[in-house]
Every structure is written in structure tokens, then in C-alpha cells.
Amino acid sequence: MKNYGAEIKSHRENLGISQLELSKRTGISHQNINRWESGTTLPNIAFCVKLADFYGVSLDELIGRENRS
């Protein structure tokens, strides 16, 4: 199974921001971000869309989905 939390974390780290900063900028709780990145829980689609928009990537890119051509 794909590690979606690692993908979310990678995008955050590429911007050079902390979980707390991501929380402040997106309005998503720090606890949720921590749980997703640690693999404890998965974000629902609404949060995925919010993160993808913030990072400026597609949903496929956010979760590390590769092109299936």
C-alpha cells in the first residue's frame, strides 16, 4: 500500500515549512496533519483537495500516483 502520509510530508518539506506553519496557512489542525504524516489516519477528499490546492499540485501528485499510460 502506498504511504500517502509520506507524500503529504514530502510536499510540505519541499516548501520548507513545519506542520504548524502548514496548519496556520491552511486552517487544518496540526493534529490532523501529524496523524496523516505518521500514517495513523488518512485525510478525507476535502482535506486532500485543500492540500493539493495549497501545494499547487494535482490530487494525483499529492498522493504520489504515477501515470498509468
Please provide the spans of the model-predicted regions.
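Phosphate-coordinating loops and pocket residues in cytosolic domains that bind phosphorylated ligands
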Residues: 64
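DNA major-groove recognition helix of helix-turn-helix/homeodomain DNA-binding modules
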Residues: 46-61
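Alpha-helical residues within the helix-turn-helix
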Residues: 13, 24, 53
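Residue-level detection of the helix-turn-helix DNA-binding "recognition helix"
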Residues: 13, 27, 38-40, 67
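A short, Lys/Arg-rich alpha-helix, primarily the initiator
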Residues: 1-14
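Short alpha-helical DNA-recognition segment
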Residues: 16-35
